[in-house]
Amino acid sequence: MGQTIRFGVSLNSELLEKFDALCDEKSYQTRSEAIRDLIRGVLVQKEWEQSDKEVAGVLTLVYDHHTSDLAQRLIETQHEQHDVILSSMHVHLDHHNCLEALVLKGPGEAVQRLSQKLISTRGVKYGKLTLATTGQEIV
């Protein structure tokens, strides 16, 4: 990590009040910490927009495992793309519903393609890809 450099930011008073309220709500000790997180968030988003960059993310799926062949179809799709899946966790939410969390890593395009294929599988009740970073491009 390089040296820390101070710089100024000019905001109108209403925006600053909202930002300070957000900092309090999120328990940031200083505005600088919040601004650093905002910048990192934009940089992670930029990584994801470059489809050849290696990215990481977590895909969350909720589905009824009693739905005909659904669990088998999801497993088959996961096996087809095993090189993108680092880890998976399967949780029984109740008698019918399961939550599956997949940790993904690979080229952005491959991660997004696999996520969309799993989310759009007939019978999946909920699916969301949470963007993350490998940390290699973030300081």
Curated annotation (Swiss-Prot):
> Which residue spans adopt a coiled-coil conformation according to this UniProt entry?
none
A molecular function (GO) held by this record is:
DNA-binding transcription factor activity
Residues involved in Ni(2+) binding: H79, H90, H92, C98
Q: Identify the cofactor(s).
A: Ni(2+)
Co-factor: note: Binds 1 nickel ion per subunit.
GO process annotations (BP): response to nickel cation
Keywords of this entry: DNA-binding, Metal-binding, Nickel, Transcription, Transcription regulation
Top-rank taxon, per record: Bacteria
InterPro entries per record: Acetolactate_synth/TF_NikR_C, ACT-like_dom_sf, Arc_rbn_hlx_hlx, CopG, CopG/NikR_regulator, Ni_resp_reg_NikR, Ribbon_hlx_hlx, TF_NikR_Ni-bd_C
* SUPFAM superfamilies with a match to the protein in the record: ACT-like (SSF55021), Ribbon-helix-helix (SSF47598)
Protein function? Transcriptional regulator.
Q: Which family does it belong to?
A: Belongs to the transcriptional regulatory CopG/NikR family.
User: Which HAMAP family does the record associate with it?
Assistant: NikR
Put simply, this protein is called: Putative nickel-responsive regulator
